[in-house]
Amino acid sequence: MAPVEHVVADAGAFLRDAALQDIGKNIYTIREVVTEIRDKATRRRLAVLPYELRFKEPLPQYVRLVTEFSKKTGDYPSLSATDIQVLALTYQLEAEFVGVSHLKQEPQKVKVSSSIQHPETPLHISGFHLPSKPKSPQEAEKGHPACEPENLEFSSFMFWRNPLPSIDHELQELLIDRSEDVPSKEEEEAENGFEDRKDDSDDDGGGWITPNNIKQIQQELEQCDVPKDVRVGCVTTDFAMQNVLLQMGLHVLAVNGMLIREARSYILRCHGCFKTTSDMSRVFCAHCGNKTLKKVSVTVSDDGALHMHFSRNPKVLNPRGLRYSLPTPKGGKYAVNPHLTEDQRFPQLRLSRKARQKTNVFAPDYIAGVSPFVENDVSSRSATLQVRDSTLGAGRRRLNPNASRKKFVKKR
């Protein structure tokens, strides 16, 4: 018997060709999920499924409940109407077969933790197992306990660099070592060479993946468990959906059928108003409107807690954009200004009437381009500013002088 009794499948489960007959006993989905699948290979697999796919529409009350909850978590802009219906169907099946007493009505508060690594630093390299090494007692003593911040809420801004360790303990060790007998140079070289060979042998075998530890490594990297006593689950690969499901207390299943304990991904956090968004395509903050969004790694645990991992690397919050002054805003029909706000209005930059007649084949005075009597617009204002057709893109716009540019590129 399959470990999960009722499984709700998202489009990602069909696109990844998940063996849903091995994951669950009863497979549910909605018709919109099947409709949005366009590739031929997946549609061919849907035509000959080895299990019965049940279509069920969620009730409006559960759709409304999931919509309100996703707005509180901040994932509502990243969810489509199909995603919300899949979440509502999972909530409805959980209410029918298990109950809603253990589900959460409000998302938990965000817990903040700091990290020395850059947020885009790869934590796990494919093909290698890098276990975390515990700190030795000497390294723990070197830390400065008085300089540790009590409240880590603003540690990414106030404490970019770790405090310098105390050197009193090291000076005492040096004085003690000088009083002892100093060994000869030959003995030191022999001992150092033996230790180097020993360290090399330890390093060679420390990070390899072997048949003995591959299952343990897969569980550590994927943060998954074998589902036990799980009656209702949802198979999805979308982070926004996983975030909502975990924070509500519902079960999330991976494509291989494992139960996901944590969902790890990235969000954008405004360092001006401290609001977050999971829409990674945004450039300006939706709350304050400034261009102050920074990428932050987050981890959603199985209890629904959202942990944000800030970086103490000073390169994350660099002072780029404060060196050169912006150009004076220009007005008029053909003004070109840098894009500074999301709701900034720009002129339409239309072509002249003579230039539009070249592309309008239904115009009474249309002349083919191969004719020797064709006229080219070279004297109008739009022609001198190199304004092109709106279908091909607007005219050339002045860039922000503080923006980064590619190096070693020849200028025209």
UniProtKB/Swiss-Prot annotation:
One of its GO terms (biological process) is maturation of SSU-rRNA. GO terms for cellular component: nucleus; preribosome, small subunit precursor. Its EC number is 3.1.-.-. Residues 5-108 form the PINc domain. A zinc finger (NOB1) spans 260-332. One of its GO terms (molecular function) is RNA endonuclease activity. InterPro entries: NOB1, Nob1_euk, NOB1_Zf-like_sf, NOB1_Zn-bd, PIN_dom, Ribonuclease_PIN, WRNPLPNID. Pfam families: PIN_6 (PF17146), WRNPLPNID (PF15017), Zn_ribbon_NOB1 (PF08772). Keywords: Endonuclease, Hydrolase, Metal-binding, Nuclease, Nucleus, Phosphoprotein, Zinc, Zinc-finger. The modification Phosphoserine is found at residues 184, 201, 325, 352. CDD domains: PIN_Nob1-like. It is an enzyme of class 3 (hydrolase). It comes from the Eukaryota. SUPFAM superfamilies: NOB1 zinc finger-like (SSF144206). It is found in: Nucleus. Signal peptide: none annotated. Residues 136-147 have a biased composition (Basic and acidic residues). Zn(2+) binds at residues 270, 273, 285, 288. Its main location: nucleus. The keyword Nucleus applies. May interact with UPF2. Component of the small ribosomal subunit, ribosomal RNA processing complex (SSU RRP complex). PANTHER family: RNA-BINDING PROTEIN NOB1. Belongs to the NOB1 family. May play a role in mRNA degradation. Endonuclease required for processing of 20S pre-rRNA precursor and biogenesis of 40S ribosomal subunits. This is RNA-binding protein NOB1. It comes from Macaca fascicularis. The lineage of its organism: Eukaryota, Metazoa, Chordata, Craniata, Vertebrata.
